[in-house]
């Protein structure tokens, strides 16, 4: 009998509670078990169960554990479960004592029992008890924010996540209302509010940010649209999942910052930060390191068979593999699996019909565990969120396909000697033909990417490029290939294939990567193979230059020369919220005639910085109206540009006080660089500006414009759709997103790329002052776009 009791204590009691509650249990048992400080810190659940068996002869401490759980509001349901298990172990049918137990329990109010039990049949007595509970818990519940009382992830449960000792979190956090093993369908459908005991913490807590999600939009029961994000933070002894309902704090939760949080709500191990909360960065003397064991717990995902044993109502966080996806009218069923079982995830609202496919990883935030007919299901609620990590393409793991690009890169094209110009190898310093794979892909310092990733990258570059055929071998020198300059050896492939951490690897990054591979270069393919080594693959542009944005931004904001480098190297989806003012935007244009893909360029600014933006969602054109203040999130930083895709969030902002952009900053954003400055800049950067056409020459599929000012001349090479523009000598070209490419004599030339845009400004040839080379050098803000 005692063995049965110990099984219940360990497997159905201690095993399912979270770290926070386990530490609480150890503290409450410290006198009985003679636990000193070191033992309370180090003893695990098995050791505590052993001590309880030794101390409490007869029931292995089960009765004591039930009493402790009953005194913890969010564990009351678990206490009832243990009482039933104890009766079973005694050989008594639970049904016999059910009424008696309910009556005995009714006096004790429980904030976590306000919702109808998830069990199947609740007796009238049980229902009455719940009603009483609800009334008594009212005052305390009033402390909780309006949003908290909504069905979305009760905060209390939030901390009990599947991630990082999450199993337990679920129990405590989820304790909200659901207790039984099965769930009433109506309860799930309505997703009733689950009032739980929350405590307003005035005193500050110092934590380190471990990870954050991107901001996302959710809908309140009042049909109001709001934005929030999730975060994980930790002290030196425990971690917390955080719901941040104030997105203006996103910057505070970036990186691995040490921050101080005050006036937050706490339920168990979950923190909620809202408009009333205060968040500030910690001082130098408040820095600390989080132990690896805490970090690992925070990242931990519970096995599905463990989830099936968890109490209904728990909140779950974790990363799971998608086995099957079924889309209904208002819900989506995601069947997840691991090596221990399967489970359904029901997504509604923002979690409905997320773009994903079998084999992808779903990172779930704040999902409620529900039970019906002994079957467990994860249900999305108001604050739930799903982040997608795309599966790896199997073909990239094939040894043959991985070797192919390297072998090809070492075989020069037979026609190379006879068709290339002397300038065709001017970019070899950036990509030496003798060591194509090392100089092309390796990082100059930290070697964080393995050979396999290099081969995969080469395979992708080879397969995804869509350059037409034989064009380059016969008509142009190597430098007319636009994208080679963008890949110096110092720009590792890490920015292309990897992201800063697992939580930044998502569908957005994969979508961005594939989009770039398909669109970023449009010069015919054979050109590259016929004039130079394999490093000249068309997609080189995806590897940002060593100082990509510095050279790009110096064309219009010299003081940012050292800042953009980090931005352009990241080459990944950015989840931070950036508030900017729109300075100007081009008209929408078709950049991919075959598929009729459209985009437009824009310039935006904060009060300190200016950013060039590529917008691939023309539905946002109205948002990018000059002088509008907008917030952008989930954008992509690449090569000195912010790239806005369909998954990017763009919203109007009523700035108070109104954002004021310094006039000097606006002027710097609209300055056209002098040609002698361009000649000395790093090749591979991108240039915007207004230039006068001195000569025009059409050769085959290319159009060459010679532009000039009072400091020199330069050639602009145009290919594809832009060759059809109506432009004559003496006109002015307003160039947007032209690549500065190398040329013999180290003068360089500007080349059109797939996202380039030209606007022709017609001039009167009889007015020489308009033809003055200097007249296009300084432009007004309105004139630039």
From Swiss-Prot:
Residues 88-99 have a biased composition (Basic residues). Residues 5-92 form the Pyrin domain. It is found in: Nucleus; Cytoplasm. Residues 192-393 are annotated as: Interaction with TP53 C-terminus. Residues 406-422 have a biased composition (Polar residues). The HIN-20 domains mediates dsDNA binding via electrostatic interactions. This is Gamma-interferon-inducible protein 16.
């Amino acid at each position: 009998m005692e063995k049965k009791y110990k099984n219940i204590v360990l497997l159905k009691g201690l095993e399912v509670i979270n770290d926070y509650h386990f530490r609480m249990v150890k503290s409450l048992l410290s006198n009985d078990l003679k636990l000193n400080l070191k033992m309370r810190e180090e003893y695990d659940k098995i050791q505590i169960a052993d001590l309880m068996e030794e101390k409490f002869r007869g029931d292995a401490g089960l009765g004591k554990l039930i009493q402790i759980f009953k005194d913890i509001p969010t564990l009351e349901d678990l206490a009832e479960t243990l009482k039933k298990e104890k009766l079973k172990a005694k050989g008594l049918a639970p049904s016999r004592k059910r009424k008696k137990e309910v009556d005995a329990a009714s006096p004790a109010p429980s904030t976590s029992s306000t919702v109808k039990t998830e069990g199947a049949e609740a007796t009238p007595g049980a229902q009455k008890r719940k009603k009483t509970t609800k009334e008594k818990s009212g005052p305390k519940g009033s402390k909780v924010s309006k949003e908290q009382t909504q069905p979305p992830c009760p905060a209390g449960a939030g901390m009990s996540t599947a991630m990082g000792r999450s199993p337990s979190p679920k129990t405590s956090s989820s304790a909200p209302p659901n207790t039984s093993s099965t769930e009433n369908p109506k309860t799930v459908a309505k997703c009733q509010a689950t009032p739980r005991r929350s405590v307003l913490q005035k005193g500050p807590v110092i934590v380190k940010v471990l990870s954050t999600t991107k901001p996302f939009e959710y809908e309140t029961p009042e049909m109001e649209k709001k934005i929030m994000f999730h975060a994980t933070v930790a002290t030196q002894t425990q971690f917390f999942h955080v719901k941040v309902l104030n997105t203006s704090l996103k910057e505070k939760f970036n990186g691995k910052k040490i921050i101080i949080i005050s006036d937050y709500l706490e339920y168990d191990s979950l923190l909620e930060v809202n408009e009333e909360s205060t968040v500030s960065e910690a001082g130098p003397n408040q820095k600390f390191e989080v132990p690896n064991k805490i970090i690992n717990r925070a990242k931990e995902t519970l096995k599905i068979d463990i989830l099936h044993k968890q109490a209904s109502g728990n909140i779950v966080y974790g990363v799971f593999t998608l086995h099957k996806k079924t889309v209904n009218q208002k819900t989506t069923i995601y069947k997840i699996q691991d090596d221990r079982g399967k489970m359904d995830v029901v997504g509604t609202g923002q979690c409905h019909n997320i773009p994903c496919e079998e084999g992808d990883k779903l990172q779930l935030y704040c999902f409620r565990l529900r039970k019906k007919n002994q079957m467990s299901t994860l249900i999305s609620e108001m604050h739930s969120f799903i982040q997608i990590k795309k599966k790896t393409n199997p073909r990239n793991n094939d040894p043959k396909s991985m070797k192919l690009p390297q072998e090809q890169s070492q075989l020069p094209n037979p026609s190379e000697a006879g068709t290339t110009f002397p300038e065709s190898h001017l970019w070899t310093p950036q990509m030496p033909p003798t060591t194509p794979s090392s100089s092309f892909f390796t990082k100059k310092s930290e070697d964080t990417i393995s050979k396999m990733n290099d081969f995969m990258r080469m395979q992708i570059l080879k397969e995804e490029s869509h350059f037409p055929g034989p064009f380059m071998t016969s008509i142009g020198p190597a430098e007319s290939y636009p994208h080679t300059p963008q890949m110096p050896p110092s720009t590792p492939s890490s920015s292309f294939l990897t992201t800063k951490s697992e939580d930044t690897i998502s569908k957005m990054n994969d979508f961005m990567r594939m989009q770039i591979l398909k669109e970023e270069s449009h010069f015919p393919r054979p050109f590259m193979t016929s004039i130079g080594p394999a490093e000249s693959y068309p997609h080189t542009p995806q590897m940002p230059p060593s100082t990509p944005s510095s050279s790009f931004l110096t064309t219009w904001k010299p003081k940012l020369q050292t800042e953009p480098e980090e931005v352009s190297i990241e080459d990944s989806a950015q989840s931070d919220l950036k508030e900017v003012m729109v300075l100007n935007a081009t008209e929408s244009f078709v950049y991919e005639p075959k598929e009729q893909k459209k985009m437009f360029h824009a310039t935006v600014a904060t009060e300190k910085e200016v950013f060039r933006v590529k917008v691939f969602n023309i539905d946002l054109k109205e948002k990018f109206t000059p002088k509008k203040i907008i917030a952008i999130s989930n954008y992509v930083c690449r090569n000195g540009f912010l790239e806005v895709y369909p998954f990017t969030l763009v919203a109007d902002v009523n700035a108070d006080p109104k954002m004021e952009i310094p006039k000097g900053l606006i002027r710097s954003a609209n300055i056209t660089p002098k040609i002698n400055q361009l000649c000395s800049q790093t090749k591979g950067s991108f240039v915007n500006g207004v230039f006068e056409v001195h000569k025009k020459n059409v050769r085959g599929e290319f159009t060459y414009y010679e532009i000039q000012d009072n400091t020199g001349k330069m050639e602009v090479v145009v290919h594809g759709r832009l060759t059809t523009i109506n432009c004559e000598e003496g006109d002015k070209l307003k160039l947007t997103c032209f690549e500065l490419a190398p040329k013999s004599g180290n003068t360089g030339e500007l080349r059109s790329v797939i996202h380039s845009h030209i606007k022709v400004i017609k001039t009167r040839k009889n007015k020489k002052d308009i033809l003055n080379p200097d007249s296009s050098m300084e432009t007004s803000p309105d004139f630039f776009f």
